[in-house]
Amino acid sequence: MTQFTLSRRGLLGAASAVLLPSVACASTPKRKYDEITDVLVVGSGFAGMAAALAAAEAGAKVMVIEKMSVLGGNSAISGGMFAVPGSSVQKEQGIDDSPEKLMADMTRIGQGLGDPELIRFVCEKAAETFEWTRKTMGVEWNTHLTGKGGHSAPRCMVTKQGTGQGILGPCAEKLKALGVPLRTRVYMEKIFREEDGRVTGVQVRQGWRFGKPESGKVKTIGITRGIVLAFGGFGADVKYRKRLDPKLGEAFLTTNQPGATAEGLRMASRIGANVIQADWIQCLPSCSPAEKGMGMASHFATIAGSLFGVWVDSQTSRRFVDEFGDRKVCTDAILGVINRGGKALAVADQNGVDEMEVVRPGLVAKILKSGALRKFDSLKDLADAYQLDLKTLEGTVARYNELLASGKDKDFNRRFDKRAKALGKAPFYVSEMSPKVHHCMGGVATNVTTAVLDVETDQPIPGLFAAGECVGGIHGAVRIGACAVMDCLVNGRQAGLSAAKNKL
């Protein structure tokens, strides 16, 4: 694997310059709080819930606060897919994979911008954390292994429920059984850092309502061991993301829930947390313009379409990209099609849909019912519906089948799935694709213990930890699909353990 020697300071980009704070420490190290807990977790997605469970298991008194009216954040609406290199499931199925192989994938796709130590940690701890979700959380996984664009091996598994709720639900039940309060509509509006550098608590608004900044009753919560920041990314914050990347303005929809905004990152910055790589913002290329938010059709495009079918430019009736490419490659290619006045179409046949049924049972029927997926009895019907040139489309399918049979994609260098069959078994299925803002690769800088690093000293801020999408420096320029769940669960668990063991 290629080795990179850039320091964290060397990774600072334009986004960090925007966020450089003037550190405002409290005037007194002894502050009175309305309520005290050992560990406070801010956010209730995968990272936050994993942190809370790990801290509670370690014997800490834990509290979880969530600003929205429901738990889960983006995790609740995610596809619930976990990349696990070197898993027991892979070994049972005879698949050769390792943490080192995923490290190489993440480094390559991330353009070398991810911190090698952080990448190594999540990859090496993924299999152990996967078993923890099964045995401790009680998560049930569909053990049919699949891939996503950028992965060099089939290592991804989906919850049996088919969404992130398959993780959050069991974890919430465990936390309730342990007596951990899960408080919704509690908005963190200030982090207190003392003159000696320690973080000792937060100011919140209880009963807060989204969109009404001054709502709720002001309270303070102190901590004896640590705060875990797990408030997620800012994909729904148009003003903030546009400031970092002017291209991502109002014209771009998002897969994120409305609460994915940037104020948590600003608060961390104000007390001296280093914020890195915040201008690396990812789009999910395979989304349907016919659906709001994340939708369901993106799963068709990335499973049936990219593993077992083709993506076609409506203007040329030909393939236009490696369908199994990383998200930036695919997003740029799809936007190119759209900007030229065409439509980017994910096409699969019945074989592809049958394969998708194994990974996500029942989902195709739901997408068809929503109207975001269309079904055709023949290629001619499909071509007529989208004004494609039938002879060219038939040639595209024939060429794809020829390349598949040879085992080498000479046109786009796609890695063919071993289960893929010749494209041609009617009926045929199509979804239109239009990228939506999806994931923020930047955030607060941390070390492998998940301690948040100070912008001036590059040393841990005592009492402050972070995990999940609010952390930068792991994925680099591009995140590979299914690695967010891995990142959140591995680092969330570590953050909970680190906070529980910490003494202020």
Protein language model annotation of sequence segments:
Residues 2-5, 10-27, 393:
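N-terminal export signals
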Residues 249-256, 475-499:
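A conserved FAD-binding loop/helix module that cradles the flavin
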Residues 265-270, 274-388:
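An anion/pyrophosphate-binding glycine-rich loop and adjacent beta-alpha core
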Residues 392-478:
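A glycine-rich dinucleotide-binding beta-alpha-beta segment and adjacent secondary-structure elements
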Residues 67-181, 185-190, 198, 310-319, ...:
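Conserved N-terminal/central alpha/beta ligand/cofactor-binding core
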Residues 193-220:
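Conserved beta-strand-loop-beta-strand element in the redox core of flavoprotein oxidoreductases
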Residues 33-45:
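Beta1/beta-strand and adjacent pyrophosphate-binding region of the FAD-binding site
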Residues 209-210, 214-216, 222-288, 491-494:
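Glycine-rich loop(s) and the adjacent beta-strand/alpha-helix scaffold that form part
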